[in-house]
Swiss-Prot record:
Compartment annotation: Secreted
Name recorded for this polypeptide: Ranatuerin-2LTa
Claim: ATP-binding is one of the keywords in the record: no
Cysteine disulfide partners in this protein: C23-C28
Lineage of the organism: Eukaryota, Metazoa, Chordata, Craniata, Vertebrata
Length: 28
């Protein structure tokens, strides 16, 4: 449903933001 789609999108956004942050901190 719609809520599942929103949760999936939020999870993806959170994961990519976490990856970017990790790259800044550790230099990938």
């Amino acid at each position: 449903g719609l809520m599942d789609a929103l949760k999936g999108a939020a999870k993806n956004l959170f994961a990519s933001a976490l990856d970017k942050l990790k790259c800044k901190v550790t230099g990938c």
